[in-house]
Each structure stands twice: as C-alpha cells, then as structure tokens.
Design a protein with these regions (language model features):
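Hydrophobic/proline-rich hinge and linker segments of small-molecule sensing/allosteric domains
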Residues: 86-109, 216-219
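Flexible hinge/capping segments at coil-to-helix
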Residues: 101-118, 122-123, 143
Length: 281
C-alpha cells in the first residue's frame, strides 16, 4: 500500500451508498493496494466545503470528492480552478433532459409551453431544474413571462441524486397540475424500463442537447502521484470480474474513464447566469 491515506468524500443520498462505498473501500485497500477511507456527507454543499478546506479549521477535509456536475463545477470555480477533475463513469457522458407530457395532450413541443404550466425538480438539480431553465431561456421561453413554473424542491442538497423531485414532476404531469415536466434521461429510462406508467400514457416530447454528470474531483494541492494511483485503481476495475461487477452495477457503470471536461459548458454558463457560483458565506 502507499503510505498516505486518501480520504474520499461521497454523499449518502440513498442507503445503497453505504454498501457501494464499503465495496469500493475493500477493493481499494485489499486488491488495488491503495489505502482509501471514506467520509459520507449529507449534502454536496458540505462535501465541497470539505474538499476546499485548508486544514486550518475543525472542518473535515477530504482529498477527493465524488461530485455531481454542479458540485464539480462549484469546486473548480471556488478554488480558482486549483481543483482537478480526475475520473468519471462511462454513464456520466451523454445525459439529456427530457420534457414529458400526456400523450396526445396540449404540449408536444417547447413552443406549446406558452401560457401553460411546467413542472421542474429541485433547485440544485442540474438535470431537472438548472439546465431545463437554461435551455428554455436559450429558446426564448422565460418562466413567469411565457409559462408558469411549478417547482418541487425535494431533497435539496442532494443535487437531484435521489430522483424524488423527478417523481414529483411525473406525478404532477399525470394528475394535471402541470401540462409538462422536465426530468433527466436516466430517470425517464427507468420509468419506462420498470413500466411505472401505463404504456402510451406519457410521451417524451423534447430532448435537450447532451451534457455530462458526475466527476471525481481532487482538492487543491493533492500530490499528483496520489491522484494517479487513485485513478489507475479505478481504471483497473473490470466488469467481467464478479466482485468488481457487483460494485460497478450498484454505482451504475461498466467502466471508469479519464476526465472529459467537454460536457460541462452548458451547465457552467447556466450556473453563471442563475447564480449557482455565488459562494455560501
């Protein structure tokens, strides 16, 4: 094992996160030979603060954080880009936001939103709130001017990871409180795969341009060799290995990839425009 323990932060948005990181820690320590310890947080705000902590206060400090796209971008912005993106999942590429509406209803395109009600998710969800508002603005559709907004601020602090606010959006579309709703493509794919709504009842009427989701992010000043060993251990996980597959499937991927920062431009612009880069006091 390397001598330096690597402290990794993750947000416990679901009980399965404990199981995932028990498996990840076991892999790192007992197979990859990398001494990792895990700190679980209740919010991404707390995790980002720990990633940026300088060690001069009693605040916990982590070396690497498993961040959402919003938390990754905030880490970069608030560290003057001294944080470093490391590794992401294959499934973090190519996310989209989908607008859903009752099949055969009044909304079949973005333009049909004029004068109607749109449901969106939690205010800190990139895929269910921040990017939907951004893409609508780009299309010339402004909330409270061109359409009414029904927002579900459920599980704020989890950045939409729980999917609870997206479930609220779907319910609002089904019961008529909203004419349409915005959800992330993985949530919508899950609804369809599990047949959670009657076949043909709800239609996917619009898709956003693609963007990227999560990113392992290194703190400012983390030794490059430490970051490399952590990253290489992730790359060595093999989906064909049953022990690895159990953890990989739980985390929703087949393989780990080097950081590809090209899929964050739209969210970066949205965060600047909507004030998500204003650092908490």
């Amino acid at each position: 094992m390397t001598e330096q323990t690597i402290w990794v932060g993750a947000v416990a948005y679901d009980p399965k996160v404990v199981t995932i990181w028990e498996g990840m820690r076991h892999y790192f320590r007992h197979e990859a030979g990398v001494p990792v310890e895990v700190v679980l947080f209740q919010s991404y705000e707390a995790q980002v603060a720990a990633l940026l902590a300088d060690g001069s206060t009693v605040m916990p400090r982590v070396d690497i954080a498993w961040n959402t796209n919003l938390a990754y971008l905030q880490s970069m912005e608030w560290s003057a880009r001294e944080c470093r993106p490391l590794v992401m999942r294959d499934t973090d590429l190519g996310w989209t936001t989908r607008m859903i509406a009752l099949a055969g209803g009044a909304v079949a395109s973005l333009e049909d939103l004029r004068g109607r009600t749109l449901a969106i998710g939690s205010q800190d969800s990139g895929h269910a709130a921040i990017l939907p508002r951004y893409f609508l603005d780009q299309a010339g559709l402004v909330a409270d001017r061109d359409f009414r907004l029904l927002q579900f601020n459920t599980d704020v602090g989890k950045h939409g990871d729980t999917g609870t606010s997206e479930a609220d959006v779907l319910r609002a579309v089904l019961d008529g409180r909203a004419d349409a709703g915005m959800v992330g493509s993985p949530f919508w794919a899950g609804v369809q795969a599990r047949k959670l709504v009657p076949a043909g009842a709800v239609a996917d009427v619009w898709s956003s341009p693609p963007y990227s989701h999560c990113m392992f992010t290194a703190r400012p000043g983390l030794d490059a060799d430490v970051a490399r060993k952590f990253s290489e251990a992730l790359y060595a996980m093999n989906f064909d290995n049953p022990a690895h597959r159990q953890v990989l499937e739980a985390e929703g991927l087949r393989t780990w990839l080097p950081a590809d920062v090209g899929g964050y431009d739209s969210l970066t612009d949205a965060c600047h425009r909507q004030g998500h880069f204003l650092r908490p006091a």
